[in-house]
Amino acid sequence: MLIPSKLSRPVRLDHTVVRERLLAKLSGANNFRLLLVTSPAGYGKTTLVSQWAAGKNELGWYSLDEGDNQQERFASYLIAAIQQATGGHCSTSEAMAQKRQYASLTSLFAQLFIELAQWHRPLYLVIDDYHLITNPVIHDAMRFFLRHQPENFTLVVLSRNLPQLGIANLRVRDQLLEIGSQQLAFNHQEAKQFFDRRLSSPIEAAESSRMCDDVAGWATALQLIALSARQNHTSAHHSARRLAGINASHLSDYLVDEVLDNVDVSTRHFLLKSAILRSMNDALIVRVTGEENGQMRLEEIERQGLFLQRMDDTGEWFSYHPLFGSFLRQRCQWELAAELPEIHRAAAESWMEQGFPSEAIHHALAAGDAQMLRDILLNHAWGLFNHSELALLEESLKALPWESLLENPRLVLLQAWLMQSQHRYSEVNTLLARAEQEIKGVMDGTLHAEFNALRAQVAINDGNPEEAERLAKLALDELPLAWFYSRIVATSVHGEVLHCKGNLSQSLSLMQQTEQMARHHDVWHYALWSLIQQSEIQFAQGFLQAAWETQERAFQLIKEQHLEQLPMHEFLVRIRAQLLWAWARLDEAEASARSGIAVLSTFQPQQQLQCLTLLVQCSLARGDLDNARSQLNRLEKLLGNGRYHCDWISNADKVRVIYWQLTGDKKSAANWLRHTPKPAFANNHFLQGQWRNIARAQILLGEFEPAEIVLEELNENARSLRLMSDLNRNLLLLNQLYWQSGRKNDAQRVLLDALQLANRTGFISHFVIEGEAMAQQLRQLIQLNTLPEMEQHRAQRILRYINQHHRHKFAHFDEGFVERLLNHPDVPELIRTSPLTQREWQVLGLIYSGYSNEQIAGELAVAATTIKTHIRNLYQKLGVAHRQDAVQHAQQLLKMMGYGV
């Protein structure tokens, strides 16, 4: 829950001086990206801006305290303030902030700006007390905020010092409106107005001016002069002389003498006790101070001018002026040291009653009350964990003695989950083993099962599927149905292990169970994970359309639950890119891979390896080897600077080996083959992929026999495990082996099998990537006119893509080739005496490549009737009557020129 007072603009009091000269300057604030108000404490920053904000409905106000250095807390309040200003316009950003479903503050702000792009009226956000922010991550995010905020948005920052927000750059570009302490200082006229409103008897203008000069227009000093004069019935000028030259760092003695020592004991104790509260209301005051009517007491303190300010329009929430509050808390530690723990305990109890466990934890920690802290955590820790209050939980658990954790083992489990969320896998097992050894008495079976569920998750994350499976099964055998979270974890892990083992049907069933449980209990990250796993399994089974539909459900879940900035979102867009690539939708595949990189923009560059691999794949499928080489340079640098799962390495090696194949780089392939480890098994898609990489390198090096052994074994495993997509890939590589080793009949046989299987998988790019060797075979099959209709259609599509992307459209019939052909001693006399025009040679090349008349017209951007004329002319010059004759004639010319066709 968010504390309402932190989002309420301070109430404008009747007796405050309206700063007309400053308000006039602020009237043009909407023309600037940043309004910055800086000064030491007590110069009236908040009062001035609250006067300026009066009447502005589309303005959000966020009052900071020390706890706002937590990124998640800062984000939640900032988005909530903007929601107040816009009347709930940014609902997606709000949901992401509330559920902590964003990768970083900058990515959350990027989503916010997408929503604000549809907001066209002036909009303001005030952040008060920004000097309390010391977290560099928040500073970086706010610099991003200022760079990218909409033109109609003005950020207003109040701070005691110059914030780290790139101020100089804004100043140079005239996008900064500044007000400092010299401008905030009261002038003579304002000081006279102030005293006239605060003192019972007026003073002369000259005396008022002298007092203003004595304290350099410092508003807090003027307020203290008026307060002291009222309390001590002395002249205001006497107080002014005492304050002359004083500053905030020397104010403590004055406040003791002139404020605390001049109130009755009851009020003094009230001030000291209530000061421990960062914000306060009636219920908190009653519990902390023991006063019977907290609201009435707060209003009385406010009337006395004791630096108490209302934080909302209803008058329910109050806070002390920061300067006075800090002074009071320091005095409280000195004067009420013995009572202080009990005061904090009372505050914690009241915050708990009002439903603010994080504030309660703050006071329990301050009280040093381990038992109270333990009780709060036992009741609320998992809720805080699910809302990503990880830093607060870690601080709290560190404050508890180990013995207390052992007496409450679920807190040990919580600490272990915190470690798991930070990828500290070895520490998780060490902690759980120590706890099991030291817990007194027989350990509860259910708790032991929860330990095992967590251990199973750690094991699979750490690349140990056998141990993960053992632990997941143990957990599921012992966990009651009501322990849904651990059951979801264990079921998910078991399904993932079966996926790794190639048991796809059972794995799919378990992942579907995981999804159902996770949706039922609103555990959305596991629901998303299970959908991603289901899609991968369906892809491996060769059911790419089913995989597409599962991905659509996952994208819908992301949209509904605002999961766009979870790292898992990158996993989803990546497998979508893989599917699009398989279907030769290369532009969409590339866009999807780039969106995955964008999701991971705030993570280590190594996390982008998989998406970068897909970008290389897209370049290779297009035949753009220059771009592929540039991307491979980046990829190989990442490979040399990180440790990766074997799946990641297999995919990265795949594009490297294909690049070496397309460029004939046998040296690199041989070096890689010498050093790459050979997996012990081939029972899942990534192990199959790495063995396929090995076979491709062997084929490139002419090592046909060992490559054939590898591929035959891969096919046997793929058929037995129903890894149909891998079987399709294996057949295509086996086809290349047979073709290059001169076994043309075997090559044709497996190519026909691959085309038939592609009716199920929909593969296109896997054929295209093999280039001209594949094109030659497909032309022959098409010419035979014996392919079934679906295979014939697919072969024609593949051939079109090869011609389009691998630059074979005119490769054999360009100007240089034609010139060499005409000078060849064996060129037919008919061609020498009636040479084709360059356009007719292009048309002949496209006919040879399998293009229809309509496709040739589209390729050359001319009318179909024009193409018919070109075809009629070239038929006449070649002395042929039919298309098939023209294809055979072109083939003979290519053979004559030394091209293997």
From Swiss-Prot:
Give me the positions annotated for DNA binding.
853-872
User: Where, in this chain's numbering, is ATP bound?
Assistant: S39, P40, A41, G42, Y43, G44, K45, T46
The cysteines joined by S-S bonds are none
Where in the numbering of this chain does the HTH luxR-type domain appear?
A: 829-894
What domain of life?
A: Bacteria
Against PROSITE patterns, the record matches this protein to:
HTH_LUXR_1 (PS00622), HTH_LUXR_2 (PS50043)
What the protein does comes down to: Positively regulates the transcription of the maltose regulon whose gene products are responsible for uptake and catabolism of malto-oligosaccharides. Specifically binds to the promoter region of its target genes, recognizing a short DNA motif called the MalT box.
Question: Family per UniProt?
Answer: Belongs to the MalT family.
What quaternary structure, including any partners, is listed in this protein's UniProt entry? Monomer in solution. Oligomerizes to an active state in the presence of the positive effectors ATP and maltotriose.
Output this protein's name.
HTH-type transcriptional regulator MalT
Q: Which organism is it from?
A: Salmonella typhi
